[in-house]
Amino acid sequence: MTAQTEFDEATVQDVVRLAGGHDSELRELTQKYDPAMISRLLVAEILSRCPPPSNDTPVLVELAIVHGSERFRHFLRVVRDSPIRPVGADEGFVGMLVEYELTELLRELFGVTHERPAGVRGTKLFPYLTDDEEAVEQIGTYLLAAQQGTEAVLAGCGSRKPDLSELSSRYFTPKFGFLHWFTPHYDRHFRDYRNQQVRVLEIGVGGYKHPEWGGGSLRMWKSFFPRGQIYGLDIMDKSHVDELRIRTIQGDQNDAEFLDRIARRYGPFDIVIDDGSHINAHVRTSFAALFPHVRPGGLYVIEDMWTAYWPGFGGQADPQECSGTSLGLLKSLIDAIQHQELPSDPNRSPGYVDRNIVGLHVYHNVAFVEKGRNDEGGIPTWIPRDFESLVQASSGGAT
């Protein structure tokens, strides 16, 4: 049974919400749900966060999660070039015991991030060796492996802010390092959302038609947003990517009615990222359908505007003929932000985007659209509209 099938989405979101609250809410959580189930959920989350191990010698790290008189023991096999995975207690040498109180581990994983360098957990090296001579004999074989293996497991037991560029490389996404250099921009614009219980929708799961590829970007966002729920939309079936806090949806980003339906079901979203087909008409359809489902204060991101110049993607080689492209959309958003400054026209009324866009940040091949109430008021009509009259009015009549 996978984490995705054992833990339904509503339960996971409820656990995350309560874990970020007051101690009374943590108590409510452990009364509302079976502690054994919570323990399994936490281990599934930890395994998804652990970096690649560096130890050459296989070793087991025992993760013990304690709640009152109950003790839930999980043995994790750690070795280089393999994912960390649960095994039986007799399937290797236990190099380290790591013990957490259930509520402490809930806070470490799903609470609002806080630095607690000490006093969070208990540890014991070579916990099941009772003979000192035997322990000395094992030092040469397992000491380094226990250290490196424990480091990898503990890295998955917290919510310290990761480096997005490193995550992009770990999960093999094109957002940094060879085709693009987006991660510094993402870090700048996403950092304030990191500790929130965000809902992120990314269009384009990756891997194209390959039945086993894709999902790297979704895993990157899952790691970056430790309390977030990540959705991925793709024209192909990418359900093999589904796991705890990641859900994929199959569908066409150029189908406005479909986009509206999924947004009503899974939104509103804090962040939408369009890294889909990059066909210009698709980009514009998706924005029109999904921007209304971004919450106030949220972001809509468009990647890969280079296709605006490529006719094979519905683009225009001449920048002056860009009205139907992704860049044409972005250029129109500047007027939308400034709509209250446009000359009065009885035949024109502000649209939804005009009233709900407050910022636009455009970089090489990636743009961030800020949503909010765009109603600060234009310059009053009694302010002169020509320079000389403005100077005279502002000079108190002085000449």
From Swiss-Prot:
Keywords: Antibiotic biosynthesis, Magnesium, Metal-binding, Methyltransferase, S-adenosyl-L-methionine, Transferase. Pfam families: MycE_N (PF17843). GO terms for biological process: antibiotic biosynthetic process; methylation; protein homotetramerization. S-adenosyl-L-methionine binds at T173, E202, I203, G204, V205, G206, G207, Y208, S217, D234, D252, Q253, D275. Signal peptide: none annotated. Changing Y208F: Decreased catalytic activity. The active site is at H278. Its cofactor is Mg(2+). It catalyses: mycinamicin VI + S-adenosyl-L-methionine = mycinamicin III + S-adenosyl-L-homocysteine + H(+). Disruption phenotype: No production of mycinamicin II and accumulation of mycinamicin VI. Mg(2+) binds at D275, E303, D304. Coiled coil: none annotated. Its EC number is 2.1.1.238. InterPro entries: MycE_N, SAM-dependent_MTases_sf. One of its GO terms (molecular function) is O-methyltransferase activity. Pathway: Antibiotic biosynthesis; mycinamicin biosynthesis. O-methyltransferase that catalyzes the conversion of mycinamicin VI to mycinamicin III in the biosynthesis of mycinamicin, a 16-membered macrolide antibiotic. Homotetramer. Belongs to the methyltransferase OleY/MycE family. This is Mycinamicin VI 2''-O-methyltransferase. It comes from Micromonospora griseorubida. The gene is mycE.
